[in-house]
Amino acid sequence: MIAHWDEVAAERDLGQAAGALNVGLRRLELTPGDTVEQGDPGAEEILFVLAGSGSSQDRRGTGSPVRAGDCIVRHVQHTGHSLRAGDNGLTVLRFVGPLARRPNLDDKLPPPSIANLGGVAADYEGDAGKWVVLARQAGAVRTGLNWGRLEAGHAGAPPHSHSADEELFVILEGSGTVELWPSPEAAKQMERETHEIRAGHVISRPPSTGISHFLRAGEEAMTFLAYGTREPNDVCYYPRSNKIYWRGLGLIARLEPLDYDDGETED
């Protein structure tokens, strides 16, 4: 459920180390002049530049400069793309989504695109912190990457769990806690848990666990990336308020939890 990038071998997938099922994450540290090729073209890929500078190159060798705070999206079936480190090296997080249907050659695919954190308007900015929907601005379709900052003592999204979406959180700065809230059925097997988290921690939340998650900053502000798949059939449950969100229907409703045998007659 939680892994720290300093405690995971460089060649190992950080997402898998944290318990991810269908998504991947690697931290790439490139020395000046190093190049890393695009991964599987059957999966949407999102890269976030943590430090340094370099260029994102297409199969024709045309390069676009990249720098810290850049979010780069490479769509399904794009091939031959690479990332090259400049004179200061390059540190990048590479998120890889689940394998998708390979589009027909006639499908209209946007080219790989880049959005910088400093150039994207925040969806929310206030006393609790700041929230930037980042990868969507760079053209992501099947997955998403958001940047968040929680001010000291403040919490993020309310406790929730997904039926189909898978999420990864990467703590970039500061520290805090992640709380795990079991659904009524899961509560028969476990109690609510709280885990300490800090910069470098990767938190995995696979789908259909029946266990909700909840982030809160500690005595200092906490900055993090939130990555997730975007499944149209996902159902999201909010245990604190007993709400259900059907994304594909655009509907949020409150339900009454019941036991399996509630209302049934004995034969």
Language-model features: locations:
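Conserved short histidine dyad/triad with adjacent acidic residue
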Residues: R26-P41, N146-H162, G210
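Residue-level "contact hotspot" at macromolecular interaction interfaces
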Residues: E29, F48, T62-P65, R149, ...
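Short beta-strand His + acidic residue motifs that chelate non-heme Fe in jelly-roll/DSBH
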Residues: E37-Q38, S56-Q57, R74, G80-D87, ...
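Glycine- and acidic-residue-biased ligand/ion/polar-headgroup-sensing regions
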Residues: A43-R59, A164-E166, V170-T177, W181-P184
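Short acidic-glycine-tyrosine-enriched beta hairpin
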Residues: R60-H78, P182-P207
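A short hydrophobic beta-strand segment most commonly corresponding to one strand
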Residues: V73, D87-R102, S204, F214, ...
